[in-house]
Amino acid sequence: KTMILTSNGQNIYPEEIEAKLNNMPFVMESLIVERDGKLVALVCPDYEAMDSYGVSNRDLPMAMEEVRNNLNKMLAPYEQITRIQLYPNEFEKTPKRSIKRYLYDN
């Protein structure tokens, strides 16, 4: 199991946050990474869901900010996501269909 250790000693399990985030509107898949001591969500948008709800690419940043706010309401203070970074394509996967995390850690 993957774990992120914060500077104040908190253990964060990104898969638990990703499971919540992947159930949010317009999120196809996600990956939680640490960047400069803060948690960032890498998100591949669900473009089909966006189309069916009439959400354009121009509206996407605002929609993702709403997703981030709703997600943070479900998380402990030390698990808060500071920003969402959009990825246009699905993440690279292993043959077992799990995301190759090491490719996105930097």
Segment roles from a protein language model:
Residues 1-78:
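AMP-binding/adenylate-forming catalytic core of the ANL superfamily
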Residues 29, 37, 66-106:
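Conserved C-terminal "lid"/linker of ANL adenylate-forming enzymes
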